């Protein structure tokens, strides 16, 4: 999350043949760029991207009635769909320009009519799109949205405009203007991806959850295509295992359909390592789904916590142990005496919550499915065979300095001659 890990390990990784990608949400500069439109291969992806954005940018679990959510999604699908279809040659399918999410914000500015009797620029653009590509999915969604009138329509536009206002920042636009993440190569090419996420401000963290949502979708389909022989020149042996090491998982934001992803990616040569400080972080983010997520993790490594709920969870998870007790008693009197012996079998937690809390700073508890818990010493990075190649400070020869080229805002308008006049006017506004 702090962005230091890439500096400490980047040079070692490149030396060993890895391509290094950096997605910096702290400074929003000197970063690789991520554009979801780059990974939209069919109109079905319009719905997937729309839902990922809605999930990633919502501010709370209480989004109001389902009617408003669905109405907003309808407009969002129409606008994203417009960009998807308009950016392709209707005859050849060739890419005329590469849209981005900032363009959706531009389209939203052109939805309102200045004159009630004159169609808005966006209305005209949809009609032109329908003439060029009759029956397209975007126009169908737009016509459904057109059924809303008056305040209902205005409210839906206002809600979606608020959601997309984040893309008015130039730095955010630059970050999503193009794509250098090359997600579709991660499971066939040695790649290390670092995502720097702010720990004190989550304004832009939704971009990381969208990145993961798109990444899981793209990589799952790519793995399936390879495993089913649909990628010439590739077979199972070419499929590299991908590890998602999600440190400070609670900072990423809610990843759409994460419970389903966690249970399905194992067969696609992917695994996820979730790193948390406390159980309640996961519960706050995923509500009742947190138990499903925990149960889908075959191995738990406990390194320490101050959280009571977490201590109790792993105390219960450790199971019970049997304790045998024996007590004897003797009585004496003037004439005779007696003695007795009592044996009992009792159960107690193998580790009580306070015992879980008091494991040594150099120790950890390991829980593996269908196995007894065991306590072991923590591994040290200084014992790793490549520890000499890891940097410790900026003055270290192994410190990795990188440069990722930015994109000027003018570079967003590729192939501007292929845009409709109305679309050009929105960009010029």
Annotated model-derived regions:
Residues 1-270, 285, 354-375, 390-429:
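P-loop NTPase motor domains
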Residues 11-15, 37-39, 288-292, 316-321, ...:
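Short secondary-structure boundary/capping segments
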Residues 83, 96, 313, 331-333, ...:
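Intrinsically disordered, low-complexity N-terminal regions enriched in serine/proline/glycine
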Residues 212-213, 220-222, 300, 320, ...:
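Short, charged/polar low-complexity linear motifs in solvent-exposed/disordered segments
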